[in-house]
């Protein structure tokens, strides 16, 4: 079975797809965002598109406590969507998680151009999962 090239897929879906969100920016300029699951930066572009690229990276909050899911797509299983995703759950502290994401994305030559975006998404998600500490109890100093 022959696969369709990513450039052709992008040319077909770039102007009209269900994930496209168009908003007006400053003045009259239009800003386009994307709600794709495999898009790290949510920017509507070929580089970040999860539809057009064979290799994609996704970082999401897990359902359970303080965990983050790092998902990458396998290039060999493109015709079987359920089997094409490789998920790993990260439960460690932030420095170890960031090292694991960097190793997975960059050091394995998977998508080194997405390192900065992946670490930014990981940072935002881990900040959102962090539980705020309760303040120190105020003592009554009147004696």
Swiss-Prot record:
One of its GO terms (biological process) is translation. Coiled coil: none annotated. GO terms for cellular component: chloroplast; cytoplasm; cytosolic large ribosomal subunit; cytosolic ribosome; mitochondrion; nucleolus; nucleoplasm; nucleus. PANTHER family: 60S RIBOSOMAL PROTEIN L28. Disruption phenotype: Pale green leaves and slightly longer early appearing leaves. Delayed leaf growth and abnormal leaf patterning, with the abaxial mesophyll features appearing in the adaxial mesophyll domain. More proximal vein branching in the petiole and reduced number of small veins at later leaf developmental stages. Abnormal inflorescences terminating early and producing several secondary inflorescences. Double mutant ae5-1 as2-101 exhibits an increased number of lotus- and needle-like leaves. The double mutant ae5 as1/2 produces severe abaxialized leaves. Keywords: Cytoplasm, Nucleus, Ribonucleoprotein, Ribosomal protein. Component of the large ribosomal subunit. Essential in leaf polarity establishment, probably having a role for translation in leaf dorsoventral patterning to specify leaf adaxial identity. Expressed in seedlings, roots, stems, leaves, inflorescences and siliques. This is Large ribosomal subunit protein eL28z. GO terms for molecular function: mRNA binding; structural constituent of ribosome. InterPro entries: Ribosomal_eL28, Ribosomal_eL28/Mak16. It is found in: Cytoplasm; Nucleus; Nucleus, Nucleolus; Nucleus, Nucleoplasm. Component of the large ribosomal subunit. Belongs to the eukaryotic ribosomal protein eL28 family.
